[in-house]
Each structure stands twice: as structure tokens, then as C-alpha cells.
């Protein structure tokens, strides 16, 4: 008998706020999910990337293989998602809508929600996460700190992991380390040796680090 397989299904949902825009996404689902943890993935810079970014897809598939329901989606103005890009000003409303859609998936466990952002997506996730109590942990990949030169309006106090490239040209480690050190709550940094900002060619080590962190988080009671 063939082993159960992961399913990948396109979905449409709406951003929060007014006007509300229809957004497109892909849900990765493990076989027969029951109280499955949920991950929502935010892709890099909309001008040059989308939800089909190699690292984003690999993370979603690997998390589904690990038993999570994973949703990756296109920000407004990207692909078939309606609206216009706003360079991070309104994209947090897209993430809010994506979380709503992800938690409505059959078998989803609303008490175990992880948000993962890559580059621009990490910036959007950092902006939004402190305002949504449903988010239990946050993973930021290649966070572009230059976008928040004056800091973030609020900070996420729950567990968080920062995955960074050894040679990140937009957010070097010497800038990321003091930023993370000053954040409240549990936090950690994972350096992907040899990688640059977008992790091209280093997706494997990045995915491995993220899946390991998520598995540990899933098994933490009350987190």
C-alpha cells in the first residue's frame, strides 16, 4: 500500500481591512491532520519574488512532511492577488487574512500557530506579530533591519528565531546580534554558513534549521 502523501491545494482568501483584496495562496496539508500545528509563510520582496520562491516552497513542503498545515501566499499586487503593493505599509493586513484562512483549514490547531517570514516577508511579520495573540512563535529569515531604522512600533515577546546568512549584505550579523539581544522573551540566532541574503544555494541548511526549531517548539507545552 502506498504511503500517505502531502497535498498541495490552491486557495483564495481575503486580506483584512477596507478595502479587502482577494489573495491567492497554496495550502500544504499532511495526511489526515488532527490538531495539526499551523505555519503561515510570507515571501520576500514583492517586486522580485512571490510565494513560489524556492526557499518558501521548500519550507512549506518540509513542514507539511513534519505534520504541520502550511500556507504560503502572495502579498497584494503579486501574481493573482488583487490590490497594489504598498512596500510594507498595508501588507500586514494580508498576513492577518492569511492567518484567518490557515486556521480555518480542517484539522488545524489554533493554539499552535507559527509565522515565518523571509526578507521583506520577515519585516511584515515583525510588524504584525506583536498585535496578534494567535501567533505563538515567529521565525525571521534574513530580516532587513534597514527597513526599521527607527525600530518597530512594538516587539514580539514570545519565542522567536532569526535565521541569517553569514554574508548577508543587507543585514550583517554585527547589526542583527545587538538587535536580537535587546528583544524581550526567548530568542535565538541561527547563522547559515556561506549564504548571502536570499539564501540561494543554501536552502537545504536553512530549511533544516527551521524544521528543527519548529519541531522543538511543537513539543513545548503551553508555548
Please state what every model-predicted region is.
Residues 32-74:
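Short, surface-exposed "cap/lid" segments of acyl-processing enzymes
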Residues 117-125:
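Gly/Ala-rich beta-loop-alpha elbow adjacent to hydrolase catalytic centers
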Amino acid at each position: 500500500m502506498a504511503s500517505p502523501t502531502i497535498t498541495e491545494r490552491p486557495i483564495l482568501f481575503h486580506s483584512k481591512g477596507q478595502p479587502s483584496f482577494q489573495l491567492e495562496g497554496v495550502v500544504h496539508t499532511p495526511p489526515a491532520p488532527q490538531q495539526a500545528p499551523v505555519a503561515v509563510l510570507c515571501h520576500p520582496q514583492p517586486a522580485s519574488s512571490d510565494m513560489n520562491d524556492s526557499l518558501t516552497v521548500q519550507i512549506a513542503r518540509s513542514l507539511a512532511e513534519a505534520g504541520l498545515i502550511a500556507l504560503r501566499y502572495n502579498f497584494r499586487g503579486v501574481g493573482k492577488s488583487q490590490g497594489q503593493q504598498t512596500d510594507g505599509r498595508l501588507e500586514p493586513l494580508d498576513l492577518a487574512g492569511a492567518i484567518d484562512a490557515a486556521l480555518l483549514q480542517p484539522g488545524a490547531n489554533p493554539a499552535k500557530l507559527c509565522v515565518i517570514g523571509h526578507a521583506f516577508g520577515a519585516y511584515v511579520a515583525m510588524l504584525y506579530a506583536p498585535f496578534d495573540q494567535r501567533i505563538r512563535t515567529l521565525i525571521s529569515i534574513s530580516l532587513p533591519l534597514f527597513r526599521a531604522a527607527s525600530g518597530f512600533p512594538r516587539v514580539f515577546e514570545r519565542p522567536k528565531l532569526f535565521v541569517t546568512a553569514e554574508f548577508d549584505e543587507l543585514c550583517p550579523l554585527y547589526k542583527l546580534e545587538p538587535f536580537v539581544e535587546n528583544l524581550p522573551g526567548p530568542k535565538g540566532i541561527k547563522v547559515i554558513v556561506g549564504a548571502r541574503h536570499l539564501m540561494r544555494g543554501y536552502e537545504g541548511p536553512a530549511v533544516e534549521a527551521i524544521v528543527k526549531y519548529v519541531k522543538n517548539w511543537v513539543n513545548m507545552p503551553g508555548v
